[in-house]
């Protein structure tokens, strides 16, 4: 009789397990929209010199870039800049609209926004004794 009660209890618990586990929602990744592959479209740099200087660079045959943000926190990049190719990996993390990208010994801090399929990164640098301050606005389009 003890074995029957034990088996009955086990059977009831076993029937309830699939029902409860299917109710649990998958974990939510806060920056889901950032994940995937992004292709470079344009870069605008505004330098705060004696006279404000604005430089705009558009994607062309000599300037191609893709970024791939992964859930693991890895970022992969492929860059062709004036015919010079560079690719590799780094680390990224985001907090609200702030984004940090670390590649080798370089760390880039900025803000990001995503509007439909356009990723906009804004990177600001304060003026120092040797360099003028600047703001760079980089736009990417989602590839997949």
Put a short name on every predicted segment.
Residues 1-27:
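Bacterial Sec-dependent N-terminal signal peptides
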């Amino acid at each position: 009789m003890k074995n029957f009660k034990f088996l009955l209890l086990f059977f009831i618990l076993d029937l309830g397990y699939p029902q409860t586990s299917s109710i649990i929602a998958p974990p939510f990744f806060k920056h889901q929209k950032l994940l995937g592959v992004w292709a470079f479209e344009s870069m605008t740099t505004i330098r705060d010199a004696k006279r404000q200087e604005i430089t705009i660079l558009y994607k062309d045959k000599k300037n191609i870039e893709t970024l791939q943000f992964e859930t693991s926190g890895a970022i992969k990049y492929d860059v062709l800049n004036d015919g010079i190719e560079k690719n590799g990996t780094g680390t990224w993390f985001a907090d609200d609209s702030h984004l940090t990208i670390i590649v080798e010994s370089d760390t880039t801090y900025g803000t990001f926004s995503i509007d439909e399929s356009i990723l906009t990164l804004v990177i600001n640098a304060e003026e120092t004794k040797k360099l003028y301050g600047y703001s760079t606005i980089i736009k990417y389009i989602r590839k997949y």
